[in-house]
Amino acid sequence: MALVNAEKPEVGSSPSSLGPRNKSWVLLMLRFVAFLATAAATIVMAANRETKTFVVATIGSTPIKATVTAKFQHTPAFVFFVIANGMGSIHNLVMIAGDTFVRKFDYKGLRWVTVAILDMLTAALISGGVNAAVFMAELGKNGNSHAKWNKICDRFGSFCDHGGAAIIASFIGLLLMLVISIISIIKLLKPKSPLVDSHVLAP
């Protein structure tokens, strides 16, 4: 009688060999769409400006005009919005490159831990940026009668429309980042089934 060490095959290893690869492609597609959404939000808000000329006074029959330009740089919340979505775009671009070219390099699962943490931080950053922009957008659309802040969207309609489109794109990117974060955490917590050595009696 001799003892022979036999490796126990992983359950479902052969029929589901395409499963992890398909899941990886799904995650890559989610990251790519999230990149497009946050990049669109960044570009639209960063390029958002509108110039209008208003009559501010009249001396006799001569109107006094003033030219005013609305730009995202005038509002710190919109500046933060551009920075947050820009960093979210860079994050997803780096993650896509990492999954595509350096997937094989993983030291004791450290890669998945780092990816999960960065995904959560990026989602939190985008959430802060878009919510700050929503607050200022609501203030620009409706004003605040208690603080005597006038609305501006009745005068700068194009500026507000472009800002609203950027906010919608950012919310899409945020939703996708939340889904990506959940997938990253599931990948991190999912136990891996190592090969189990079993002793088989051989005649």
Swiss-Prot record:
Pfam families cross-referenced by the UniProt entry: CASP_dom (PF04535)
Membrane-protein topology: Multi-pass membrane protein
Keywords: Cell membrane, Membrane, Transmembrane, Transmembrane helix
Transmembrane regions: 25-45, 77-97, 115-135, 166-186
Localization, UniProt: Cell membrane
Extracellular side: 46-76, 136-165
Protein origin, superkingdom: Eukaryota
Coiled-coil intervals: none
The keyword Transmembrane is annotated on this UniProt entry: yes
GO cellular component terms, semicolon-separated: plasma membrane
The keyword Transmembrane is assigned to this record: yes
Database matches in InterPro entries: CASP/CASPL, CASP_dom, CASPL
Residues on Cytoplasmic side: 1-24, 98-114, 187-203
Main location: membrane
Family in the record: Belongs to the Casparian strip membrane proteins (CASP) family.
Subunit and interaction comment: Homodimer and heterodimers.
Name assigned to this protein: CASP-like protein 1B1
Organism for this UniProt entry: Ricinus communis (Castor bean)
